[in-house]
From Swiss-Prot:
Sequence similarity: Belongs to the purine/pyrimidine phosphoribosyltransferase family. PyrR subfamily.
PANTHER family: BIFUNCTIONAL PROTEIN PYRR
Gene Ontology BP, a term: regulation of DNA-templated transcription
Name of encoding gene: pyrR
Protein name (record): Bifunctional protein PyrR
Length: 179
């Protein structure tokens, strides 16, 4: 069974709200770098980057981060007959002494974010990393907490939260899927 918990209108309002929060927290946007975790986190990062540009007139540097080889659960993610494919980052941007705005679609156990933090070290030593999560569903296994949250959605472990984006799904919405 599937229930739409965020429709397109709410999706775009959430992007706008998070963008406003980032601007309000940082008077100087010059030291910010936007990092989106591939795949849907990167698309959400692009939406936030464009909204910040629209609101502030400032275009922030950004990269799409592939965390494939930093994961601790590859044997569970990839089929046994298939080797993982690493696509790398979209480009190299140094994050040395910058504030990184790390963006992903869903925060669940925290393991994806841990992998992203490990991958981020390859781009330099950031002054600070702030985490943006579109949907926080709880059930953390690691001590990770988001600085900006689009929506908190309490779930059972058997439920699934699916953030759908235009590039991958042809729409902007969030679905709660019960088994």
């Amino acid at each position: 069974m599937e229930k739409i918990i965020i429709d397109e209108s709410q999706f775009m309002r959430t992007i706008s709200r998070i963008s406003h929060e980032i601007i309000e927290k940082h008077q100087n946007l010059n030291d910010l770098v936007i990092v989106g975790i591939k795949r849907r986190g990167a698309e959400i990062a692009d939406l936030i980057k464009r909204k910040i540009n629209e609101l502030s007139g400032q275009s922030l540097p950004s990269i799409d981060l592939d965390i494939t080889f930093y994961r601790d659960d590859l044997e569970y993610v990839e089929p046994a007959s298939q080797s993982p494919v690493y696509s790398g980052a979209s480009e190299f941007i140094s994050v040395q002494n910058k504030t990184v705005i790390l963006i992903d679609d869903v925060l669940f156990t925290g393991r994806t974010i841990r992998a992203a933090l490990d991958a981020l070290v390859d781009f330099g030593r950031a002054a600070k990393v702030e985490l943006v999560i579109f949907v926080d569903r709880g059930h953390r296994e690691l001590p990770i907490r988001a600085d900006y949250v689009g929506k908190n959605v309490p779930t059972s472990r058997s439920e699934k939260v699916q953030v759908r984006t235009m590039k991958f799904d042809g729409c902007y919405e969030v679905a709660l899927i019960s088994k």
